[in-house]
Every structure is written in structure tokens, then in C-alpha cells.
């Protein structure tokens, strides 16, 4: 099983590009991969996305990998894993972008159609612990930072940009605390 996070130049996989990918092997957490790439030629870049990940268009233009090379390196990394089970925090957009990229470059999709979602695991943990998850406008209010806080992981700085590998590691640590009752090498806080 592996925990993955991606950053994009926007939210539409047809118009926007994958720009970074971070992945952690859940059972061998020292085995990681972090890649950044140039914008796909002709793809759009939304300034709102920059505010999330902090990777400027100018910075991305200097990257040596293309989106196609990034996806190919990721698929090679995954091919070394015995399990192709994908884990992530609300991974649907990540799945959508990678699936579209595999189609675009005629790469085989080696994954199943089921994914383990941290949000769902956290909601289940709240209820199993006799607690109600926090709500906002009638919906669960459990982003990655809120789940990390629930797991006893110190909060990130409010000004800290998202980084695909940092977020994949944080997600892996949350999964480990919720499913196995213990953190992994990425932090020393104990779940309460």
C-alpha cells in the first residue's frame, strides 16, 4: 500500500497539469518518491493553485521533468511495490489527474478502482471512539490538518505551503495512528 499526494496547476485535469507528486510506501515509510515537473505544454496555471502549493509558473518552467516523465517514474516506483492499493486524503482529484495522464500518454493503469480515503477512516474512528466528527454547514469538517490535530500531530504553520511529499508523509502518519494506533517515523507525537 502506498500513500500519495499530488499538486496541480488547477483543478481540471483536461486544462491543468500535474506539477508535483509525493508518495510513501505505507509499510516501508523510508521508501518515498518526490517529483516536480514542468507544466504540460498548453496547460493553464491558476494563481489560486499557487497560493496552495507555492510553486510559481517560473519555477516550474525550470524543472527538467515533463509531466509524462513524472508519471512514468511514479509508475516505475509503484511497480516495485507488492501492493498497488492507493491511500490518500480525499484522493479523488489525485486519481482523476493521474488516470487522465495515463490515458494521455497511453500508459496502463495498474491500480484497482477502490482507494482508502483518510477522511472516511477518520470519520469511522470518531464514531468508534464515541465522538462525533466536527461539522461545518452540515458536512464533516475534516481536512488533513484537522485530522492530524485529532491524531495528536502538532499543527503546521498557517503560512506553510502544501508540498506533495510532506502531505503524503503526514497522511501516512495519520493513517498509521488511526489504523495501527501508532505513529510512524515522520513524527514523535503520540495519539491520545
What are these regions (language model features)?
Residues 56, 108-110, 154, 185:
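Short coil/loop linkers at secondary-structure junctions
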Residues 85-91, 96-97, 101-102, 133-192:
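Acidic, Mg2+-coordinating catalytic module of metal-dependent nucleases/exonucleases
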Residues 1-99, 147-156:
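Conserved non-catalytic scaffold segment of RNase H-like nuclease domains
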Residues 115-137:
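Short alpha-helix plus adjacent loop in nuclease-associated cores
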Residues 8-10, 120, 170:
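Short, glycine/acidic-enriched loop or turn micro-motifs at the edges of active sites
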Residues 103-113:
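A short alpha->loop->secondary-structure connector
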Residues 11-13, 123, 173:
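Conserved protein kinase catalytic core
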Amino acid at each position: 500500500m502506498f500513500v500519495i499526494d499530488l499538486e496541480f496547476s488547477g483543478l481540471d485535469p483536461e486544462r491543468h497539469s500535474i506539477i508535483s507528486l509525493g508518495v510513501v510506501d505505507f509499510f516501508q515509510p523510508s521508501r518515498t518518491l518526490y517529483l516536480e515537473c514542468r507544466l504540460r505544454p498548453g496547460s493553464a496555471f491558476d494563481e489560486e493553485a499557487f497560493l496552495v502549493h507555492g510553486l510559481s509558473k517560473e519555477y516550474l518552467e525550470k524543472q527538467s521533468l515533463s509531466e509524462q516523465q513524472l508519471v512514468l517514474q511514479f509508475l516505475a516506483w509503484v511497480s516495485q511495490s507488492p501492493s498497488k492499493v492507493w491511500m490518500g486524503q480525499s484522493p479523488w482529484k489525485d486519481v482523476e489527474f493521474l488516470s487522465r495522464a495515463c490515458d494521455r500518454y497511453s500508459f496502463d493503469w495498474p491500480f484497482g478502482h477502490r482507494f482508502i480515503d483518510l477522511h472516511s477512516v477518520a470519520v469511522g474512528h470518531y464514531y468508534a471512539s464515541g465522538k462525533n466528527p466536527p461539522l461545518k454547514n452540515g458536512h464533516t469538517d475534516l481536512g488533513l490538518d484537522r485530522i492530524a490535530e485529532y491524531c495528536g500531530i502538532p499543527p503546521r504553520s498557517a503560512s506553510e505551503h502544501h508540498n506533495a511529499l510532506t502531505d503524503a508523509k503526514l497522511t501516512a502518519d495519520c493513517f498509521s495512528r488511526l489504523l495501527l494506533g501508532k505513529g510512524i517515523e515522520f513524527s514523535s507525537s503520540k495519539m491520545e
